[in-house]
């Protein structure tokens, strides 16, 4: 039996997911409930084709940019358990969307401890660090 929820390694063990800093992945947000698996964590698996691995705090500028490039994150979509985001919400964002926003100067700040390590296959740690959110 293999796991498909992003936590398994196929042999029955469930290793704790790691973040981009190499430590245990921390929860991104429970309100709104985020993550591909809607468990608050930016973890991923084979069924997460968008790779929702970057924990961000969205801004109005980012939300406008995302809508302009065809990904409306502001409008609620209850059929996908998606509440619609507003400025200040934390959310597990697709790594390619974050990279695109960064290239256009509108990347939202990230919570490094809550970004899944697999994001580093697409973006550089230094780029994430340059946009790191200082938590209170």
Q: What is the role of each PLM region?
A:
Residues 116-136:
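Glycine- and charge-enriched low-complexity intrinsically disordered segments
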Residues 74-81:
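Short alpha-helix capping/helix-loop boundary micro-motifs
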Residues 57-72:
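Short, basic/aromatic beta-hairpin or loop at an interaction surface
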Residues 98-121:
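Short, compositionally biased
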Residues 2-61, 132-134:
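Extended boundary segments
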Residues 57-59, 100, 126-127:
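Exposed, flexible binding/inhibitory loops of compact, secreted disulfide-stabilized domains
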């Amino acid at each position: 039996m293999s796991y498909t929820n992003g936590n398994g390694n196929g042999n029955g063990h469930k290793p704790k997911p790691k973040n981009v800093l190499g430590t245990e992945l921390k929860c991104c947000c429970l309100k709104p409930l985020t993550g591909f698996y809607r468990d608050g964590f930016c973890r991923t698996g084979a069924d997460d084709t968008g790779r929702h691995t970057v924990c961000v705090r969205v801004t109005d500028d980012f939300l406008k940019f995302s809508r302009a490039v065809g990904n409306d994150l502001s409008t609620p979509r209850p059929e996908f358990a998606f509440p619609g985001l507003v400025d200040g919400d934390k959310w597990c964002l697709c790594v390619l969307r974050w990279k695109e926003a960064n290239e256009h100067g509108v990347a939202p700040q990230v919570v490094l401890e809550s970004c899944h390590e697999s994001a580093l296959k697409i973006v550089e740690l230094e780029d994430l660090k340059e946009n790191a959110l200082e938590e209170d």
